[in-house]
Design a protein with these regions (language model features):
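Hydrophobic core of transmembrane alpha-helices in multi-pass small-molecule transporters
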Residues: 18, 99-114, 303-317
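Helix-to-loop junctions at the C-terminal end of transmembrane segments
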Residues: 59-72, 264-277, 361
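C-terminal ends and interior cores of transmembrane alpha-helices
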Residues: 81-96, 287-299
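Helix-loop-helix hairpin linking two adjacent transmembrane segments in secondary transporters
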Residues: 96-101, 129, 138-184
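Cytoplasmic helix-loop-helix junction between adjacent transmembrane helices
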Residues: 103-141
Length: 396
């Protein structure tokens, strides 16, 4: 495949990621508040957001199988069709004021996300080994566009029409249709038929792959990134509402948070190449610890903006670091099962944490939600330090 075609694919994946992330950030901005208004039991207010991660975790392995069977282009097109259904069901749930239908619509967005999680790996597959971390970073950087588009689309649409928020979720349909058009233009290389003996064809057992220290750190880094980020994003709109901030303030905070998540992606790949993946992961953990300190020391608007921006930075370093590390631990024939296991585990952890976020907030408040994250961060920090001390050199 020619170099121009390879990077054209990366650009198309960047655009389709931007469209999905716009829909995702819109939903993250609004679903906690919508859930709070619609749920009879306020402990379930964050259930719609938790259902996004349930949908993602449930789709990770099926999506991997589908992508391998019908190809990445057709598989990604199928994902956007699920996105259309997500917008339709969520919109209908709001029109009918049905909390459970609305939650199903959010779960379908998670299923769509199950396909989009493979965009970064498709980009890595499309370029030479030396450029993999840059390709991953670039696709994830699409969130910078979504950082502006998502919250502003939420602000613009939430009060349109007779039923608040209905048009916000209807816009997901339009975004998904646009994404369908973009991914239909992909020209991804077909899977290579791998040779001969049974061991080479099947690769190592998954159990053997996940015993690798790099696999453990890659998995732990991504899981920590998503659990901490998910808890922060899920509870921030509700916490700000509880502290008496204006109704449009959470959208601004989420916007800065998403900028923190995705803006560094333009240079994270280069930082990994210069300083090594272990140092980037270590820095990401320190940033998440700093987030907790800022979050629990005040509930003003500045605290929320600063804390959420920093948790975004930490997420970026941990997620891109973990993803880059993961691409080095599997052989080509082991790619699908390793990627699927990684993302299934990550989003299962995020789903569980998001499900309990509302109950944690109602019972222990904003500080309690954040302090409960400390043990996970400490464990990840210890593993990262051990890997750094072992002085394992990997060429990125």
């Amino acid at each position: 495949m020619k170099t121009t075609v390879k990077w054209n694919n990366v650009w198309l994946l960047f655009l389709s990621q931007a469209l999905f992330q716009t829909a995702s950030i819109l939903v993250i901005t609004l679903s906690g508040v919508v859930g709070l208004q619609m749920a009879a039991d306020k402990n379930l207010a964050t259930l719609p957001i938790a259902m996004i991660t349930v949908g993602t975790a449930s789709m990770m392995i099926p999506a991997s199988i589908i992508l391998k069977k019908i190809g990445q282009r057709k598989g990604f097109m199928l994902g956007t069709i699920i996105g259309v259904l997500s917008g339709l069901v969520s919109w209908y749930g709001i029109i009918q004021q049905s909390f459970w239908i609305f939650s199903v619509g959010n779960m379908l967005l998670g299923a769509y996300q199950g396909f989009t999680q493979y965009y970064r790996f498709a980009a890595a597959d499309a370029v030479p080994d030396a450029a993999k971390s840059k390709a991953i970073s670039f696709v994830i950087a699409a969130g910078v566009i979504a950082a502006f588009a998502g919250p502003n689309l939420a602000k613009f649409t939430q009060h349109l029409g007779a039923v608040p928020y209905a048009y916000s979720y209807f816009s997901i349909i339009l975004l998904s249709i646009l994404a369908f058009g973009v991914v239909s233009l992909l020209k991804l290389q077909k899977p290579i038929n791998l040779p001969t003996n049974g061991t080479a064809k099947k690769g190592r057992p998954l159990k053997e792959i996940i015993k690798n220290k790099d696999t453990i750190l890659a998995l732990l880094s991504s899981a920590t990134a998503f659990v901490v980020m998910g808890m922060a994003m899920t509870t921030t709109p509700i916490a700000m509402h509880g502290f008496g901030h204006p109704s449009d303030s959470p959208a601004t905070v989420i916007q800065w948070h998403v900028l923190g998540m995705f803006l560094p992606s333009f240079f994270t790949g280069m930082l990994i190449q210069k300083f090594g993946v272990y140092r980037i992961i270590f820095t990401g953990i320190l940033l998440l610890l700093l987030y907790i300190i800022i979050a629990v020391t005040g509930n003003g608007f500045t605290n929320f903006v600063t804390a959420l921006f920093i948790v975004g930075l930490g997420w970026n370093f941990l997620f891109i670091g973990g993803s880059s590390l993961l691409t080095k631990v599997y052989r080509p024939e082991e790619k699908e099962k390793t990627q699927a296991f990684n993302d299934f585990t990550v989003f299962t952890a995020m789903a569980i944490s998001s499900f309990f976020a509302g109950s944690l907030y109602n019972n222990f408040g904003w500080n309690g939600v954040n302090l409960v994250l400390l043990p996970l961060l400490i464990v990840t920090l210890i593993v990262a330090i051990r890997m750094m001390k072992a002085d394992i050199k990997t060429d990125y």
